[in-house]
C-alpha cells in the first residue's frame, strides 16, 4: 500500500458521534452573523456584544428590565381588540389577532406598566412589534390614553418605547383616529408640566411616528433605528432620486435636529433616570446598579 493510499484508507478513519445541541442555546446576530450564546445576549438586552447591533426585544422584557425590580404593575389589560368591521384581506382580521396573540402571548401591541425607576414614580409603555408589526389599533390608543391618565393621576412622568409600522389598516378610521386621540392626551400631560420621554426604537414608522412618537419633551432613539413616515423605498420611487446613505436612521435624524439624543439600550435605564430626575427636580442617581430581568 502506497503512502497516499494509507492516508485515505477508510480503516484508519476514526468514526465520531454527532453531538446534538439543544435548540435555543445559540443564535446568530442579524447584522454581523456572529454566533452568540443566547443567555449572554439576553443579559445584554438583545444587543450584540460583537458589533453592538440592537436586535428586537419583547415589550414585556423591555419594561421589566427598565423599571425597578418588583415595582411593576400592569395597566390597561382590560382593553381587548374586537373585529368590529369584520375586516378581511388575504386573511380574516379575527384570525390575525388570534395568531398574533398565540405567538406573542399578548392581547395587543402595547403594554403599559406603572412602577419606579431608581425610586421615582413612573408610568412606562412599550410597543410589541411582533404583534402585527406593532401597529396602532383602537386598543393601543386606549391603553396609551390610560397610561397618560394614570400619569396625570399620580403626578409622575411618562416614558414610551415605540416600535411600530404605523396604523393598523384592518381597523381603518378607528385606527387613524388614535393619532389625534393620543396627541390630545399628551397635550393634557404637557399642560400639567409632567415630563414625557419618547424612546424611538427600530422601526418607528407611519402614524405612530407622526403622532405620539415625536411629541416627547425629549425624543431619544436607539442606535441605527429606522424612523420616518413612509419607508425609504417608497420615497425613492416617489421623488425618483437616490436618498442619502443612512437616510431615516437615528444618526441622520440627530444630525438634522429631529431627535435629541441617541442612547444605547443597556444605558437607557440609568440615563433616562438622570434626565427625569433633572426634569422633576429629584436627586440624580449616582450608580447604575444591575438587576435581573423578571
Curated annotation (Swiss-Prot):
Family note: Belongs to the AccD/PCCB family.
Name of the featured protein: Acetyl-coenzyme A carboxylase carboxyl transferase subunit beta
NCBIfam families reported for this sequence: accD
InterPro entries cross-referenced by the UniProt entry: AcCoA_carboxyl_beta, Acetyl_CoA_COase_Trfase_b_su, ClpP/crotonase-like_dom_sf, COA_CT_N, Znf-ACC
Native source organism of the sequence: Blochmanniella pennsylvanica (strain BPEN)
GO BP field: fatty acid biosynthetic process; malonyl-CoA biosynthetic process
Gene of this entry: accD
Domain CoA carboxyltransferase N-terminal: 25-294
Cofactors (names): Zn(2+)
GO cellular component: acetate CoA-transferase complex
Function: Component of the acetyl coenzyme A carboxylase (ACC) complex. Biotin carboxylase (BC) catalyzes the carboxylation of biotin on its carrier protein (BCCP) and then the CO(2) group is transferred by the transcarboxylase to acetyl-CoA to form malonyl-CoA.
Entry keyword annotation includes Transferase: yes
Zn finger region (C4-type): 29-51
Keywords on record: ATP-binding, Cytoplasm, Fatty acid biosynthesis, Fatty acid metabolism, Lipid biosynthesis, Lipid metabolism, Metal-binding, Nucleotide-binding, Transferase, Zinc, Zinc-finger
Entry's cofactor comment: Binds 1 zinc ion per subunit.
GO molecular-function terms, A-Z: acetyl-CoA carboxylase activity; ATP binding; carboxyl- or carbamoyltransferase activity; zinc ion binding
Primary residence: cytoplasm
EC assignment: 2.1.3.15
Amino acid at each position: 500500500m502506497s503512502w497516499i493510499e494509507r492516508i485515505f484508507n477508510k480503516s484508519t478513519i476514526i468514526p465520531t458521534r454527532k453531538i446534538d445541541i439543544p435548540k435555543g442555546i445559540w443564535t446568530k446576530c442579524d447584522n454581523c452573523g456572529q454566533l452568540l450564546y443566547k443567555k449572554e445576549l439576553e443579559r445584554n438586552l438583545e444587543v450584540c456584544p460583537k458589533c453592538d447591533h440592537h436586535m428586537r426585544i419583547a415589550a414585556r422584557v423591555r419594561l421589566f428590565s427598565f423599571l425597578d425590580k418588583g415595582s411593576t404593575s400592569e395597566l390597561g389589560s382590560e382593553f381587548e381588540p374586537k373585529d368590529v368591521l369584520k375586516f378581511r384581506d388575504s386573511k380574516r382580521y379575527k384570525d390575525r389577532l388570534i395568531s398574533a396573540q398565540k405567538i406573542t402571548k399578548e392581547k395587543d401591541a402595547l403594554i403599559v406598566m406603572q412602577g419606579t425607576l431608581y425610586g421615582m414614580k413612573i408610568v412606562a409603555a412599550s410597543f410589541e412589534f411582533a404583534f402585527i408589526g406593532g401597529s396602532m389599533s383602537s386598543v393601543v390608543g386606549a391603553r396609551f390614553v390610560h397610561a397618560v391618565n394614570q400619569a396625570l393621576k399620580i403626578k409622575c412622568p411618562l416614558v414610551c418605547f415605540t416600535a411600530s409600522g404605523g396604523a393598523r389598516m384592518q381597523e381603518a378610521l378607528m385606527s387613524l383616529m388614535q393619532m389625534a386621540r393620543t396627541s390630545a392626551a399628551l397635550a393634557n400631560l404637557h399642560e400639567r408640566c409632567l415630563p414625557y420621554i419618547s424612546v424611538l426604537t427600530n422601526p418607528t414608522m407611519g402614524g405612530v411616528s407622526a403622532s405620539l412618537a415625536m411629541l416627547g419633551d425629549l425624543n431619544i432613539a436607539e442606535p441605527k433605528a429606522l424612523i420616518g413616515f413612509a419607508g425609504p423605498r417608497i420615497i425613492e420611487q416617489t421623488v425618483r432620486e437616490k436618498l442619502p446613505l443612512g437616510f431615516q436612521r437615528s444618526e441622520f435624524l440627530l444630525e438634522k435636529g429631529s431627535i435629541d439624543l441617541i442612547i444605547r439600550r443597556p444605558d437607557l435605564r440609568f440615563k433616562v433616570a438622570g434626565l427625569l430626575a433633572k426634569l422633576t427636580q429629584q436627586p440624580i442617581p449616582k450608580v447604575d446598579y444591575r438587576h435581573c430581568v423578571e
